[in-house]
């Protein structure tokens, strides 16, 4: 069950946890700058799914949306995007501003649903720390209840900014429960030693993924 207050709602019990995200992102930015001496806006290099940098960036997040936890494979990689955690509109509309907005430490792996829902929501002040997905602070704001819905922790129940974030990203939606089930099935398949059972689960997984994605088109 996923009801413990220290449990990361984005993970099942067998999911790898996010670790050293800031260090890994810094290392990736260093590699980009080494490969491209005149690079200014890191977003331009990281967001291209055809480039190796996107793969490296997504692996920092264990190939999962940093906000809801959906896995690449449950939804197509083409439905994943690189989000500006602090939206671009907060920064000046010039090269300096775009460079600041596009620094790797302000970029987050996000599914299409979360990124488009978040939109131009301004995250500032204390909320840059409270909702930070990189250091797992966000996992203290939301939780899974007994029915695997994502809920706001009681301590933040009256917080309008948190509620707005929750509603915009549709974190309480039914399909977030299905994504969690699919994550559980995927992890179980990886652990199974019986190929026949694994094959049956893979077939079930595939059918659920198709149904899930058709429903949301």
Predicted regions and their residues:
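Extended, low-complexity, charged intrinsically disordered regions
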Residues: 1-14
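Short, charged surface segments at domain edges that flank catalytic/cofactor-binding sites
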Residues: 2, 17-67, 91-101
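Beta-strand-connecting loop/turn residues
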Residues: 63, 78, 83, 147-148
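Short cysteine-rich clusters marking metal-coordination/redox-active sites
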Residues: 65-68, 111-114
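Histidine-centered nuclease catalytic patch
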Residues: 70-109, 118-125, 129-136
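Helix-loop elements that line ligand-binding/catalytic pockets
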Residues: 127-182
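C-terminal, charged low-complexity interaction regions
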Residues: 158-217
């Amino acid at each position: 069950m996923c009801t413990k207050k220290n449990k990361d709602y984005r993970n099942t019990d067998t999911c790898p946890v996010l670790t050293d995200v800031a260090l890994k992102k810094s290392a990736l930015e260093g590699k980009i700058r080494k490969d491209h001496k005149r690079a200014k806006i890191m977003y331009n290099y990281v967001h291209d799914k055809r480039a190796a940098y996107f793969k490296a960036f997504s692996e920092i997040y264990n190939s999962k949306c940093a906000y809801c936890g959906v896995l690449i494979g449950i939804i197509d990689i083409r439905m994943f995007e690189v989000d500006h955690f602090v939206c671009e509109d907060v920064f000046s509309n010039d090269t300096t501003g775009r460079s600041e907005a596009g620094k790797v430490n302000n970029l987050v792996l996000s599914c299409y649903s979360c990124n488009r829902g978040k939109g131009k929501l301004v995250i500032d002040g204390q909320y840059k720390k409270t909702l930070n997905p990189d250091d797992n602070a966000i996992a203290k704001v939301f939780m899974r209840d007994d029915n695997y819905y994502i809920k706001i922790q009681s301590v933040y129940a009256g917080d309008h900014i948190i509620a707005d974030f929750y509603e915009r990203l549709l974190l309480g939606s039914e399909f977030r429960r299905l994504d969690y089930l699919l994550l559980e099935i995927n992890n179980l398949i990886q652990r199974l030693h019986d190929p026949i059972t694994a094959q049956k689960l893979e077939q079930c997984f595939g059918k659920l993924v198709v149904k899930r994605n058709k429903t949301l088109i």
